[in-house]
Amino acid sequence: MKDRFELVSNYQPQGDQPKAIDQLVKGINEGRKHQTLLGATGTGKTFTMSNVIKEVNKPTLVIAHNKTLAGQLYSEFKEFFPNNAVEYFVSYYDYYQPEAYVPQTDTFIEKDASINDEIDKLRHSATSALFERKDVIIVASVSCIYGLGSPEEYREMVLSLRTEMEIERNELLRKLVDIQYARNDIDFQRGTFRVRGDVVEIFPASRDEHCVRVEFFGDEIERIREVDALTGEILGEREHVAIFPASHFVTREEKMKKAIINIEEELEERLKALREEGKLLEAQRLEQRTRYDLEMMREMGFCSGIENYSRHLTLRPAGSTPYTLLDYFPDDFLMVIDESHVTIPQIRGMYNGDQARKQVLVDHGFRLPSALDNRPLRFEEFEKHIHNIVYVSATPGPYELEHTPEMVEQIIRPTGLLDPIIEVRPIEGQIDDLIGEIQQRIERNERVLVTTLTKKMSEDLTDYLKEIGIKVTYLHSEIKTLERIEIIRDLRLGKHDVLVGINLLREGLDIPEVSLVAILDADKEGFLRSERSLIQTIGRAARNAEGRVIMYADKITNSMEIAINETKRRREQQEAYNEKHGITPKTINKKIRDVIRATHAAEDQEEYQVKEEPKLSKMTKKEREKVIAQMESDMKEAAKALDFERAAELRDLLLELKSEG
């Protein structure tokens, strides 16, 4: 079992990083429960945390407040720890409509979801890694506090296979079905197995390329091989292999029987209560739905929406804490909360929203009351999982300030870049003044971010700037994640010179080409102009040596004063450090493709694209066969998904490649 973290980097800790690393490591080793890393934008907080993880050498959970940020962190940690298990655990839904009921219109909305198979694979990879090794970093979104199956049950259901082990072939098949693998001799994919005489091939739920081939001689396993699922190429011999369940909600047969009895008892009690209240329609609805689920569980071992019965399946008492990803970690793991000023309030709010929706379903006979126990953790339950935690933020929130009176500061940037100079200018004539500033930046091939207070103002300003010939675009909340990434990329490439937005110019928008951030109506106190929002927005100009911030305001508010003073304090520290060490600030030179790559989580290998024709002449015979096999598989997948244009494109290319070969 591998159990040491190996940090791979061309950089050494610089500036404030060595001091911050030492303080955090010392705090963890001394058993300090809560610590906060107050890290200014661009000071290399991820690199600092990577060094801390390496030094304390504990399994680590990193929680981010959205999938995009989690994907960015996943990519960065994967680069720093290429020889360790860096995993990704976010919600596997591309689209999710939870079941709900609107009593006013008597409308029941069925659960509707589209599951991303790649992310499901990564979730299984994350949980199995925790049972197999200690050098694990899991980057997760807040979905990690939602219910998952029992870790003990999951561990007990792992199928351990060894060479020379005595087991009947049919018994192995039964055990695979018990852990929710499906037999499919034709469409072999993740979470399935196929049988060919004395050979059983298993496609683990945590993989997408390699499968396990188990060869029998009588009632004994003669050989275990790892095989390329696409080409059939043998990759190696194995003495032992562990097959993890294909679902996190797996239950042994005897537990399932007990759970079914308990569900039936609860159903009878609930039906009696509903009938006594005169809710006959609700009682009929509940009985019909629950009995159908019970029949499915008896016959198949699972049903649609089985997570709503998770309390019974794990034999937990009513109201008890559900199992989550946090229970899969050992007791002394390290937790890191990224952008904690946003993530902590998000964790706090999850429980109430979930309960409000489910209570309506219970009241109107769509679910049993036990469905309320399939829920995210309450905040106090989440706190019980904290052993060592590091909050990471440029602007720590009240919770972090309360629990960590002493901050670990990281103000100095390794690049020598300073926090930007801030000017306050009057609101009267702000647009004309702004246009003059934009023109100066365009001449120097630099970019500008403008933040407004309302959607209408953003749209009007964008239209006005377009009319006078400025290349401008508008970023708003309705733009999808990938479109947003494209817009940021186009800004960096110079297709746009100005980006206008409302609350979108804060966390995670690191664009070195931006030399000016303009904050309109800076003196309007509120969420968008609070001290934290202002400091985060100011930080967007800290990646450029010419960084400036202009606040348009008629008076200096308390929030403005705090933000200006904090920025000034940091800048003075940075200037003193640069002077002492003879450092000249230089704008970060960040490759433009990094912006895109960092946000496509878990894409270790570039997807095969039709436009990028493989050069067959430069390939070996084996490589050529693999490319052709992959294309055939892609063509069939496209046809199955009714994407016939893509399938035809692949077919034509395939014929061309085969004729060349």
UniProtKB/Swiss-Prot annotation:
PROSITE patterns linked: HELICASE_ATP_BIND_1, HELICASE_CTER, UVR
Residues reported to bind ATP: 39-46
InterPro entries to which the protein is assigned, alphabetical: Helicase/UvrB_N (IPR006935), Helicase_ATP-bd (IPR014001), Helicase_C-like (IPR001650), P-loop_NTPase (IPR027417), UVR_dom (IPR001943), UVR_dom_sf (IPR036876), UvrB (IPR004807), UvrB_inter (IPR041471)
Subcellular locations according to the entry: Cytoplasm
GO annotations of cellular component type: cytoplasm; excinuclease repair complex
Ranges where the Helicase C-terminal domain occurs: 430-596
Annotated UVR domain residues: 625-660
SUPFAM superfamilies (UniProt xref): C-terminal UvrC-binding domain of UvrB, P-loop containing nucleoside triphosphate hydrolases
Leader sequence residues: none
Statement: the UniProt record of this protein carries the keyword DNA repair: yes
Chief location of this protein within or outside the cell: cytoplasm
Subunit annotation: Forms a heterotetramer with UvrA during the search for lesions. Interacts with UvrC in an incision complex.
Family indicated by similarity: Belongs to the UvrB family.
Name of the featured protein: UvrABC system protein B
